[in-house]
């Protein structure tokens, strides 16, 4: 070390507290002076009431100092307690400084401890009401930058220690242009208490921290990195709330005004002491005022308000700055596209390889916890606090403004662990499946080891299906519609018609239903007859609400329409149930629009009866007949003589149990996918079979007999008038009585009388009170010569 560095015997002192910076820099003799040690001692002897404060003359040019500490305890310890406390104090602070010197300065731990414990001086305050002293470690040298960097370490030591002296260390002295009262001098002219020397040290240089006289016993260390490198250029991080908002919070805490409030900025707020105008007692501890100012520090994402001097003489207040940090966490989670807002206002969450609604359980909270380890370290620790997690969750909900359209992949079948492509048979999982935002799924995991064609379950299943719908020439059309209907339940798109499963009891309708439910899980829902017989959009309708996004709806056990009082199927309902959107809300909810993707299957033992029949209705009805009866041995003979059955098979008593245990789940799913590829690629095809409905017979036939009259028929009026037609208002019409006579040639009035009367009542018009007519022409009347 350079000789100039090893020694300094010129002591620079301030003559009062609060010397202006300009006077200090210009070394105005009214405020500052420099002394040799003997000169300083004579000056104090000659001026016993003087106030002198030791300081570095020019920190940039020379900043080597002895390690020193200022301890100020607002209590008087007796001699025994003091000796015990001072001994522990020396051990604690030497260990603390040695650890810091080893970590940040590369010093030898043992050498630092040895130099500090072997040689130090202690002053003693003449104030009998408190325990106050300055301690100078005479052979342990460092730089002012090092002491400033050590400030936080010593502050943490003072907080954690149980030693009253250690807890009373004033860390505020470790700052730029710091000062320490010279031994034997007053704090101000009106204060008669001073610090005095104690044996064995009776030379003034032993009590000066800027006096440097290195020898063989001395030990010097300094920061390996500059203080500027340890402290960030900008204290205020982007993740914090705005600095202005934070300082306003600080101001509200004090209640009393902060005189130098406008002097605080992002770069200096930790170094500028707060000057408080104590109009009222301190808001933190209720004391009338404080001798030392409060100061701010920045730790762990929060502003810490503490008092300089003895920091324990006032409460410490923490102001969290994590508002924007929690907002940034929410933004980062949103950037993963793992939380979306649906068009119905629901939140869906991508968790465990599938999209799920956030309604039944707090899935957003679970997502936040599961995604925590993917976030930067400074963010992940914040999410361990339940309060902050709730804040992040609220931020996520508030930030989700734009809704997304979901469930727009009709050829994708969602599972708990991924998505099955019905077209190419590929199964997507993880991020590959994430892009298919399907909010409902089967509710079970796809297992490709069971999704195979060659298996004992498949062999058993095929026998069951072939018993229910035999592969015969007579049943070929029926079997094809059966396969089309069931495989269409995989498709997530609106179906053009409803299918009736019509047959007597014990013909396999319920078995088919249970197989389908096992294969598609939660995409299947069973509902009641009310969706067919009651007004749909009148009040809450949980039956319709439960259909939202389901792919199969089974309506079981229609009433016997021959019974008096039974409601007929409303044709308006049939039309509405084939629309993409069905109106119906759950109880206590305003969600009325339900997306209709379901294949609606009506399981009935009785032929359906409709309140009104027209072409629109007939285009929306398909019928699959079930004519194989499954009987117990005791009833087999009677069943074989029943014309309603084509075949009679023995009932397998254990079949229901196997289906409920999902034995045939993946076998039937494989079969459905196979049928889907056969019938519904490239487009889904499901055609009506109105000819299978007895009530439709009249309307199907009459459509081949009549056409509506128009102006193009007027030139034919010469021939038509001979057949009973008349011209009324330039329209060819047929009088009601003539129409009844002509129609009776095609329909038996005893069988179709009600249908004929309904048709007439719907289409007849009045020429006057007594004359009625229809604007129809029989096709044979205009096609025959």
From Swiss-Prot:
<comment type="subunit">
    <text>Homomultimer; hexamer. Interacts with OPG148.</text>
</comment>
<dbReference type="InterPro" id="IPR051620">
    <property type="entry name" value="Viral_Helicase-Primase_Cplx"/>
</dbReference>
<dbReference type="InterPro" id="IPR027417">
    <property type="entry name" value="P-loop_NTPase"/>
</dbReference>
<comment type="function">
    <text>Multifunctional protein required for genome uncoating and replication. Major viral uncoating protein that is required for the release of the viral genome from incoming viral cores containing the viral DNA genome. Possesses an ATPase activity that is required for hexamerization and uncoating.</text>
</comment>
<dbReference type="GO" id="GO:0016787">
    <property type="term" value="F:hydrolase activity"/>
</dbReference>
<keyword id="KW-0378">Hydrolase</keyword>
<keyword id="KW-1035">Host cytoplasm</keyword>
<dbReference type="InterPro" id="IPR014818">
    <property type="entry name" value="Phage/plasmid_primase_P4_C"/>
</dbReference>
<dbReference type="InterPro" id="IPR004968">
    <property type="entry name" value="DNA_primase/NTPase_C"/>
</dbReference>
<keyword id="KW-0547">Nucleotide-binding</keyword>
<dbReference type="Pfam" id="PF08706">
    <property type="entry name" value="D5_N"/>
</dbReference>
<dbReference type="Pfam" id="PF03288">
    <property type="entry name" value="Pox_D5"/>
</dbReference>
<dbReference type="InterPro" id="IPR014015">
    <property type="entry name" value="Helicase_SF3_DNA-vir"/>
</dbReference>
<dbReference type="GO" id="GO:0005524">
    <property type="term" value="F:ATP binding"/>
</dbReference>
<comment type="similarity">
    <text>Belongs to the orthopoxvirus OPG117 family.</text>
</comment>
<dbReference type="GO" id="GO:0030430">
    <property type="term" value="C:host cell cytoplasm"/>
</dbReference>
<keyword id="KW-0067">ATP-binding</keyword>
<protein>
    <recommendedName>
        <fullName>Uncoating factor OPG117</fullName>
        <ecNumber>3.6.4.-</ecNumber>
    </recommendedName>
</protein>
<keyword id="KW-0347">Helicase</keyword>
<dbReference type="GO" id="GO:0004386">
    <property type="term" value="F:helicase activity"/>
</dbReference>
């Amino acid at each position: 070390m350079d000789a100039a560095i090893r020694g300094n015997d010129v002591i620079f002192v301030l003559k009062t507290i609060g010397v202006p910076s300009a006077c200090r820099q210009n070394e105005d003799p009214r405020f500052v002076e420099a002394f040799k040690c003997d000169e300083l001692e004579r000056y104090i002897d000659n001026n016993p009431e003087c106030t002198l404060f030791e300081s570095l003359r020019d920190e940039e040019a020379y900043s080597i100092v002895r390690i020193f500490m200022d301890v100020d305890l607002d209590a008087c310890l007796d001699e025994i307690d003091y000796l015990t406390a001072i001994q522990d104090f020396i051990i604690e602070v030497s260990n603390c400084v040695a650890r810091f010197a080893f970590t940040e300065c590369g010093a030898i731990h043992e050498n630092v401890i040895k130099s500090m414990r072997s040689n130090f001086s202690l002053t003693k305050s003449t104030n009998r009401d408190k325990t106050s002293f300055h301690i100078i470690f005479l052979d342990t040298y460092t730089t002012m930058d090092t002491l400033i960097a050590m400030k936080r370490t010593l502050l943490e030591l003072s907080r954690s220690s149980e030693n009253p002296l250690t807890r009373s260390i004033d860390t505020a002295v470790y700052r730029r242009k710091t000062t320490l009262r010279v031994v034997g001098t007053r704090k101000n002219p009106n204060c008669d208490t001073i610090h005095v020397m104690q044996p064995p040290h009776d030379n003034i240089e032993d009590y000066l921290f800027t006096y440097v006289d290195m020898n063989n016993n001395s030990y010097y260390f300094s920061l390996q990195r500059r203080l500027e490198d340890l402290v960030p250029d900008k204290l205020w991080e982007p993740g914090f709330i705005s600095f202005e908002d934070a300082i306003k919070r600080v101001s509200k805490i004090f209640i009393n005004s902060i005189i130098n409030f406008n002097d605080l900025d992002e770069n200096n707020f930790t170094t500028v002491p707060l000057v408080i105008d104590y109009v009222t007692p301190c808001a933190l501890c209720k004391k009338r005022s404080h001798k030392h100012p409060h100061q701010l520090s920045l730790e762990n994402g929060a502003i810490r308000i503490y008092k300089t001097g003895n920091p324990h003489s006032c409460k410490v207040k923490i102001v969290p700055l994590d508002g924007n940090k929690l907002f940034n966490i929410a933004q980062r989670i949103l950037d993963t596209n793992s939380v979306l807002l649906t068009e119905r206002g629901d939140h869906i969450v991508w968790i465990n390889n599938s999209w799920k609604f956030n309604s039944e359980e707090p899935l957003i909270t679970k997502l936040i916890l599961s995604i925590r380890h993917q976030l930067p370290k400074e963010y992940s620790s914040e999410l361990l606090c339940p309060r902050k997690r709730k804040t992040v969750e609220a931020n996520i909900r508030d930030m989700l403004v734009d809704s997304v359209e979901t469930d727009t992949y009709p050829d994708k079948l969602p599972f708990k662990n991924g998505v099955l492509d019905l077209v190419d048979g590929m199964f997507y999982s993880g991020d590959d499946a994430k892009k298919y935002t399907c909010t409902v799924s089967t509710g079970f995991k796809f297992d490709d080891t069971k999704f195979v064609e060659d298996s004992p379950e498949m062999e058993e299943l095929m026998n069951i299906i072939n018993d229910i719908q035999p592969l015969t020439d007579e049943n070929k059309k029926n079997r094809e519609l059966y396969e089309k209907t069931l495989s269409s339940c995989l498709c997530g798109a609106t179906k053009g018609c409803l299918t009736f499963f019509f047959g007597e009891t014990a013909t396999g309708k319920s078995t088919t239903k249970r197989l389908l439910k096992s294969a598609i899980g939660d995409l299947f829902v069973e509902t009641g007859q009310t969706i067919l017989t009651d007004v749909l959009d009148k009040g809450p309708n949980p039956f319709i609400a439960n259909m939202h996004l389901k792919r199969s709806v089974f309506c079981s056990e229609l009433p016997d329409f021959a019974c008096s009082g039974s409601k007929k199927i409303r044709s308006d309902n049939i039309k509405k149930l084939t629309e993409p959107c069905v109106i119906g809300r759950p109880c206590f909810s305003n969600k009325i629009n339900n997306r209709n993707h379901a294949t609606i299957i009506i399981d009935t033992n009785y032929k359906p009866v409709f309140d009104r029949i027209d072409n629109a209705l007939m285009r929306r009805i398909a019928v699959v007949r079930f004519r194989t009866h499954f009987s117990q041995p005791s009833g087999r003979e009677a069943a074989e003589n029943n014309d309603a059955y084509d075949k009679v098979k023995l009932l397998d008593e254990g079949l229901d149990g196997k289906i409920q245990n999902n034995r045939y789940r993946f076998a039937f799913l494989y079969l459905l996918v196979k049928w889907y590829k056969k019938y519904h690629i490239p487009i889904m095809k499901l055609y009506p079979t109105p000819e299978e409905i007895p009530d439709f017979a009249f309307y199907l036939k009459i459509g081949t007999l009549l056409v509506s009259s128009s102006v193009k028929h007027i030139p034919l009026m010469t021939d038509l008038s001979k057949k009973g037609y008349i011209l009324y208002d330039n329209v060819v019409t047929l009088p009601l009585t003539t129409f009844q006579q002509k129609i009776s040639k095609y329909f038996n009035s005893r069988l179709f009388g009600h249908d004929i009367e309904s048709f007439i009542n719907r289409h007849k018009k009045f020429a006057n009170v007594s004359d009625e007519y229809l604007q129809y022409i029989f096709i044979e009347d205009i096609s025959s010569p």
